[in-house]
Amino acid sequence: MSEQRKPCKRGCIHTGVMLYGVLLQGAIPREYMISHQTDVRVNENRVNEQGCFLARKQMYDNSCGAASLLCAAKELGVDKIPQYKGSMSEMTRKSSLDLDNRCERDLYLITSGNYNPRIHKDNIADAGYSMPDKIVMATRLLGLNAYVVEESNIFSQVISFIYPDARDLLIGMGCNIVHQRDVLSSNQRVLEAVAVSFIGVPVGLHWVLCRPDGSYMDPAVGENYSCFSTMELGARRSNSNFIGYTKIGISIVITNEAL
């Protein structure tokens, strides 16, 4: 795994405040997205036949958390999704967990906090961002367990200072928060938050999928990569202004206890 870029100390607090506008929200600059409305069901069949890991390009600007969770759940053997009120699965009467727009949309409604019909937005593209507690909620609805890792660094400290409710929300739902991630087992996947840098300046945060073998899936590109550094290279190829990803020390470990 490549060496992580160290954030510039100058103005780091200001940068942290700016980043918190998209706190773990899965937000990534619009110009970085290659395509928004992408259905990859055909691609799913191809990668499954090859026995490879799954990849999914996010449908919406801020749905990287949902797209990453969808791939993680499929790789961990989940094949059903709840037909909750207002979901596309309910409307189509389908309960299979597929690598398609229906399932990403249904998960995104949960991870963005728009699953409640009273606050449901007419335009899902404007639904908002995937927050840690809502990702954990969606993970549990899929029958999986999750805990949050919050390593001690400038990013996590700024986030905790500006958004103290984040920890309380997780604790309130009985989600464990630890300060160090253990070695992953084959029945685990990780949704990892990274800072996105353009022209050397952190401009947003983004969720990516990490696996026990060290490989990654970047939903902004919709591709799998052997390691963190090759994922950065893939992102650079998609946008000449992109500089890199920086790990911020916050991640969600997802486990299928049945495996």
UniProtKB/Swiss-Prot annotation:
GO terms for cellular component: extracellular region; host cell cytoplasm. It is found in: Secreted; Host cytoplasm. Its EC number is 3.4.22.-. Keywords: Host cytoplasm, Hydrolase, Plasmid, Protease, Secreted, Virulence. GO terms for biological process: proteolysis. The lineage of its organism: Bacteria, Pseudomonadati, Pseudomonadota, Gammaproteobacteria, Enterobacterales. It comes from Shigella flexneri. The keyword Protease applies. Disulfide bonds: none annotated. The active site is at C64, H206, D218. Induction: Expression is temperature-independent. Its main location: secreted. Changing D218A: Lack of activity. Virulence factor that eliminates N-myristoyl protein modifications in infected host cells. Could also cleave an array of N-myristoylated host proteins involved in cellular growth, signal transduction, autophagasome maturation and organelle function. This is Cysteine protease IpaJ. Disruption phenotype: Mutants are not compromised in their ability to invade cultured epithelial cells or to form plaques on BHK cell monolayers. GO terms for molecular function: peptidase activity. It is an enzyme of class 3 (hydrolase).
